[in-house]
């Protein structure tokens, strides 16, 4: 199976940038579980592990950074939940808080319940972002209308966790989570251009597959119709730009 990308320049945003410091990925909206922008201990001290006990066996160390820890970047479930529309709503995040993210793939999943057993329900078709360079860069991405996965039904007052994954070009996955409580739209704080906008220097590309080449022959490579899967996500981005 061959992986390809198709540029979508019309999706590039034209909004303001904001200044950031060096770190990893941060969820802007809904409110994320907490600050997991920490790197503690050393690779040698952890014997090459991504997570290990400190030498005194009293604390965990994260020599590569907390955000490399599945499912929520080393952060436990939060009691400070954000009300989120019961029919779906906005998800906004900042992807460039670390070196090596000039290109990255974005996944957004949801886990159901106060303490979800897993995050196995994809909310969007994955897409690729293209940043200005491999140095840390400012900027925000917002999907103004992320809907619940097909077949998932929730009620007002139910709890869930939204998981944002940034798959970096060196293969590492960075995890971040936001704990939510479903509410009626009129009971949810307004989402506006202060917390939901798309920065002009971050562009978007689709991710799709082509059929494999059999027996090294030069057979025609067919591209399946992926647009029906990815267009809703990107139309949501474009809609957010128009409404900002």
UniProtKB/Swiss-Prot annotation:
Binds 1 copper ion per subunit. InterPro entries: BIM1-like, BIM1-like_dom. Its main location: membrane. A lipid is attached at residue 215 (GPI-anchor amidated asparagine). The keyword Disulfide bond applies. It is a lipid-anchor; GPI-anchor. Cu(2+) binds at residue 24. Disulfide bonds join 72-177, 142-196. GO terms for cellular component: plasma membrane; side of membrane. It is found in: Cell membrane. The catalytically essential N-terminal histidine His-24 is post-translationally modified by methylation to prevent protonation of the histidine side chain, and protect the critical active site of the enzyme from oxidative damage. Belongs to the X325 family. This is Lytic polysaccharide monooxygenase-like protein ANIA_04702. It comes from Emericella nidulans (strain FGSC A4 / ATCC 38163 / CBS 112.46 / NRRL 194 / M139).
């Amino acid at each position: 199976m061959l992986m390809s990308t198709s540029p979508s320049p019309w999706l590039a945003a034209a909004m303001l940038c904001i200044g950031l410091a060096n770190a990893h990925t941060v969820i802007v909206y809904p409110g994320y579980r907490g600050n997991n922008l920490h790197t503690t201990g050393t690779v040698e001290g952890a014997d090459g592990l991504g997570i290990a006990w400190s030498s005194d066996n009293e604390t965990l160390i994260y020599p590569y950074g907390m955000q490399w820890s599945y499912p929520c970047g080393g952060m436990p479930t939060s009691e400070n939940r954000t009300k989120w529309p019961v029919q779906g709503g906005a998800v906004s995040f900042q992807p460039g808080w670390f070196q090596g993210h000039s290109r990255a793939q974005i996944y957004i999943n949801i886990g159901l319940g106060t303490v979800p057993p897993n995050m196995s329900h994809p909310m969007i078709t994955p897409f690729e972002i293209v940043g200005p360079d491999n140095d840390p860069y400012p900027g925000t991405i917002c999907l103004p209308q992320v809907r619940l996965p097909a077949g998932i039904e929730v009620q007002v007052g139910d709890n869930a966790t939204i998981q944002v994954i940034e798959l970096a070009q060196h293969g590492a996955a960075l995890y971040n989570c936001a704990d939510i409580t479903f509410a009626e739209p009129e009971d949810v704080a307004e989402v506006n251009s202060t917390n939901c906008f798309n920065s002009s220097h971050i562009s978007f590309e689709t991710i799709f597959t082509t059929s494999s080449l059999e027996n090294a022959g030069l057979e025609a490579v067919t591209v399946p119709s992926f647009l029906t899967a990815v267009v809703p996500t990107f139309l949501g981005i474009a809609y957010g730009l128009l409404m900002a």
